[in-house]
């Protein structure tokens, strides 16, 4: 029955995806655009290639330019072979090549550049950006106009903004499963002055309340101290966090406007965290779960399993701990994805890793274009994976029902807290102490 339900859900997703694709093709074609620019990210092939194929089938003169984090010279050669509908691929992290290419195409001129791959010529090298401050403040006017035309709630609109690229932690020694794709293993960040200026401009132009920072990780503590002026904008932010932060950091982030985050806990086993090289421990992760709940910052996080060197004790050690955490944000259980160029990838035999996703519709993909992999599951550990899954499912159910670690009664002159751990305990607060607790 469960398999039939999953199959039905897959069919509905496929149907909806096709309807969305048809609408996108219709809108682009009706715009009578001469050039389509597309930012290709990892795992984005299926939708992008089908979009390009359909657009070219109804307008063979449409020029398609692709750029983005997927576009290295090596991968660009593979991509344009798999999808000949693409005319140009930019292997350039800066905007200069793109601007010159578009201007020349609009004037029907040819343009030769060592950072551009076409069907006739491969890019010779990658142009890596050296700093971010020269990048213009992003223009969302067409998006905002569309929101207004559709009469959607503008006050709920979320706009992305980039403060940094790369991972400062990974620049030193990355997590075991993350290679950040080899050539991009560097960290760049905009100056505090640039960030504050851009955010003020976005706030003034679009009256936005929500920003999603696209950074892989929040900046270091010293940087956050220099952008405290963000607080004055009164906006709400999403930011990805590392787990090696303290209460002072959490308080500062909340004051700045952080209301929602994905945080890289990954596990509640100190041994597993050491293997991953997360720079944290199980007790620190639990402490941060408490802090983030206390400061009313909503979080998502993944509990990872399925490493090639998995140990049974990594998972068994946390099974008895989880019932004490039902009042805190639960994780999603995920089989780990291994990035190309990561420590695990480089230390694994080719037959030990399976590519993720890319070959669902495109069997022609070679290993050179694969980015994400999974290790083969150890059959001897399936029972402990199942136990962990059941525990996390119970955690989610308890949390969604408002599970409380303690019961609070405020129907007398103060607050009475009854807590049940290994024993039953009672706490009484009156006056100012009660008001502080209930704040």
Kindly label every feature range from the protein language model.
Residues 1-18, 39, 179-188:
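Acidic/glycine-enriched edge-of-secondary-structure segments
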């Amino acid at each position: 029955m469960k398999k039939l339900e999953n199959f039905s859900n897959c069919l509905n997703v496929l149907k909806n995806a096709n309807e969305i694709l048809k609408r996108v093709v219709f809108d682009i074609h009706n715009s009578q655009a001469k050039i389509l620019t597309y930012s290709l990210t990892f795992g984005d092939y299926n939708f992008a290639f089908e979009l390009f194929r359909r657009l070219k089938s109804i307008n063979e003169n449409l020029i398609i330019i692709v750029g983005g984090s997927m576009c290295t010279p090596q991968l660009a050669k593979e991509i344009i072979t798999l999808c000949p509908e693409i005319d140009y691929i930019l292997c350039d992290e800066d905007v200069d090549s793109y601007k010159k290419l578009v201007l020349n195409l609009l004037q029907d001129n040819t343009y030769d550049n060592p950072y551009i791959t076409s069907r006739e010529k491969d890019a010779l090298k990658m142009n890596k950006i050296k700093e971010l401050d020269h990048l213009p403040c992003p223009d969302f006017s067409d998006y905002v106009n569309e929101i207004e035309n559709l009469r959607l709630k503008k006050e709920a609109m979320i706009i992305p903004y980039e403060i940094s690229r790369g991972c400062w932690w990974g620049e030193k020694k990355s997590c075991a499963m993350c290679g950040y794709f080899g050539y991009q293993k560097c960290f760049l960040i905009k100056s505090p002055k640039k960030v504050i200026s851009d955010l003020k401009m976005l706030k003034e132009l679009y009256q936005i309340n929500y920003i999603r920072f696209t950074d892989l990780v929040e900046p270091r503590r010293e940087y956050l101290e220099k952008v405290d002026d963000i607080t004055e904008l009164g906006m709400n932010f999403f930011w990805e966090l590392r787990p090696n932060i303290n209460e002072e950091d959490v308080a500062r982030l909340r004051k700045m406007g952080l209301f929602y985050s994905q945080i890289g806990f990954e596990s509640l086993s100190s041994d597993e965290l050491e293997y991953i090289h997360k720079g944290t421990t199980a007790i620190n992760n639990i402490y941060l779960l408490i802090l983030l709940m206390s400061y009313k910052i909503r979080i998502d996080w993944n509990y990872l399993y399925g490493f090639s060197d998995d140990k049974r004790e990594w998972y068994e050690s946390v099974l008895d701990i989880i019932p004490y955490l039902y009042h805190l944000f639960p994780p999603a259980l995920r089989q780990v994805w291994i990035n190309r160029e990561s420590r695990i990838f480089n230390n694994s035999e080719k037959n030990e890793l399976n590519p993720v996703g890319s070959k669902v519709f495109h069997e022609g993909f070679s290993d050179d274009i694969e980015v994400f992999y999974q290790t083969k599951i150890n059959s001897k550990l399936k029972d402990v994976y199942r136990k962990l899954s059941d525990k996390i499912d119970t955690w989610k159910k308890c949390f969604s029902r408002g599970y409380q670690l303690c019961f609070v009664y405020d129907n007398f002159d103060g607050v009475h807290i009854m807590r049940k751990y290994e024993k039953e305990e009672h706490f009484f607060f009156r006056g100012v102490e009660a008001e502080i607790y209930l704040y």
